Each structure stands twice: as structure tokens, then as C-alpha cells.
Amino acid sequence: NLATAHNSSATKQNAQQLADALGIRLNNGAITQLVEASRDVLCNEYGYDDSKWPSLVMENIQARIRGHLLSSFAAIHGGVVVNNGNKVEVALGYCTLYGDAIGVLSPIGDCTKCDLFALSKQINELYEKEVIPWNLLPEVSDKIEWETPPSAELKNDQLDPMKWFYHDQLLDDLLSGMDPCEYLRAYQSKELFAGKYGFWLKLYGLDDPQEFVKDFCWFTSTLRRNAFKQLQTPPILSLSSKPFGTIPVIQGHAVYPQCEKLLKEITEA
């Protein structure tokens, strides 16, 4: 366990519980000293003022220190590092190069977060015990409830920016060839609310046209901006016809230029 100063007690307990359930050794440690040493070198040796840094600088330092330690552990034991990013995180670049993006194989890189929720439940049922802590899995009824919300825990009160379930489905459909303009037209006509997206659109407040457009633009532009991370993901164990590594990608900032008129119409409706 490579604990940061921001790790919750629940996270530490979950790590111990999982190790116990699988019968594997857990080594507990903290990366705080290395993080502070990195800050000191940048400030005292190179003259940077950490009060002027965006928070992402220290978040990435923590992730890269973890990557460094994992690589060192692997070298000591004659092993390798396995990547733990899921498909949505890879798509949106929600990882740090040379940090949590390292590894020789990405076994779950073709699984969305929702796939992993379902797989975790199947594992618990198969083993007839709590292997994957239940507090990590959401309860979905007329709402979604998290006992332990997904978080990188690299700063205080940090939560994942993704709208889980909705963004998982949107990514799957876009990668499977869904026409984004047809998707927007279905939203305009309200047809989208009658299908698989309806529940999640309402749950996340995306029945508000302005919020919908804001989220769609964020998602699609983030997807395009992070092509360079998608290309540098370790080899992915393919479970679908469209895993990253087999998809031609384009680095850019544009939000599907062919959809700009539709997005404007939805916003002004």
C-alpha cells in the first residue's frame, strides 16, 4: 500500500481486507517523505515557488513516485508491474504518464468501470465471500449511492470527474461507431430519454440542455486531447472489438466540428 497523506482509513482497510481474502502479502508504507523531498528539491535547488503551482503538479508527483516505487519493487523481486487503469480512465487520460500509467500489461484496460463493478460482484458470488469490498461497489435504485466514492485520493476531498455508468455507456457507443450528431438529435427529440441513457441523463441533471452540452463538450474534447496517453497505455488484454491500441486516434481539441450547430441549437432551446 503506497499511502499518500490523503488516503482515507477506508482505503487502507480495503487494501488489507482484499489481501486477506486473496491470501497475499500486503506491505504497508507511505510516500509522504519522498513527496516532500521532491517538493524541497524543486523549491530549494531550482527556485520554484510551490504556492504558485496548480494542484495537479503535486498530484502527478505522488503518482510518479508510486510508479517509481512499484518499478523498484518489481526489479527487487524479479517481477513486473501490472497496470490497473480501466477503459474510461485510459480514454480520458485520467492517469499520470510514468506514474499509474506504467506496466507491462493492462488486464482491465478494455473494461469500463461498470464492467468492473459487475465483475466484482460476480467474483464475490463465485467465491461466496467478500473478496472485493462491497463498500467500493455502488448501489443503484432510483439513485446511485456510494459508501466509498471513487477517488484518486491525491488531494483533499477529491472525487473522480466522471459520471459513472453514463460516461461508460457513451464511450462504448462512440468507440463502436455511434454518430455523435445522431446522438445529439436523439437528445433534441427526447428520444434519448426513452432508451438506456434516460435514467442516467436525469440522475446526473443532464436533462438540463445547457448541462448536457457542457458535459458532452467536456467528455468529447477530453477524449480527443488525451490521444497521446491512449497510445502510451501498456498492451491491453482485449475483451471487445475496440480496445485502445487498435483504434486510430487523433490528438486535438475540437469537439466534433460537425456537431457544433446541433450543440448550439440544444443550448438555445
Question: Where are the predicted features?
Answer:
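ATP/NTP-dependent adenylation/nucleotidyl-transfer catalytic domains that generate, transfer
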Residues: 1-269
